[in-house]
Every structure is written in structure tokens, then in C-alpha cells.
Amino acid sequence: GATLDAWEKVVDATDESERAALVNEMLAATTAHPRMTNHVGSGWHLHYRDDGRPLGAVLSSLISVGTALHLTGRGMHRLSRCAVAECAAVFADTSRTGRQRYCSQRCANRDAVRRHRARGVPPVR
């Protein structure tokens, strides 16, 4: 839907300013003023949306706020696509060093094997 299309534009943004502008557009379109709530006795927490919104609107709000919190808290570069050309998966880099390149260990291993084979080293038997 429209939310995921907008989110993919954030992922594919070429610089921090563009990424921030796109996230700000998502926030403006999907969120309300933040407020504290303790509905149904679930404990105090923040809501970034109006009560009674349909599920799609709630999810759009969560995606935009979550993305903004991740990028401002972890770093603007920590949202990316997998480095494996055949994989278009998106991942949020939560690594300690901020240098995650792959969406999964499987893709990291596949790319390591591809690079090893490209060097022309005969397989160990």
C-alpha cells in the first residue's frame, strides 16, 4: 500500500536530508500529537495517533514513528537493503558497529561463498 511505498522511498533515500524529509512527510500524514495514555490498564505509554483509528492507520503511524525513532536513536544510515544483488530485503541495522550489510546470516554466507568462488580458489575436498 501507500505506507510501504513511502517507507521504501525512505529506505532508498540517497542522503540523510532526503531521508529525514521523507520520514517527516510520513509522520505528518500518519501521526497525531504524542500523548501519554494508560488505556485498559496496560501501563503508561505514548500514543502517536488518535484513538479509534482503523488498523491500517494505526500501522502507518507505528511504521513512521518507529522508523523515526530508529534513525534518530541508532543513526540515519541504519536502514538499508541487503548487499546481495539478488535480494531486495530491507533491514534495520541493529549491530553494535553500525556496519551491517546483509538482511540475514543466510545472505551473508551466500555472498561469502560467491566471493570465495570468484577468487578461483579450488574447493577443499
PLM feature spans:
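Short helix-coil boundary/hinge micro-motifs
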Residues: G1-D93, P122-R125
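C-terminal structured interaction module
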Residues: S95-T97, R115
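Short metal-binding segments enriched for Cys and/or His
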Residues: R110-P122
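Cysteine-rich micro-motifs
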Residues: T97-A108
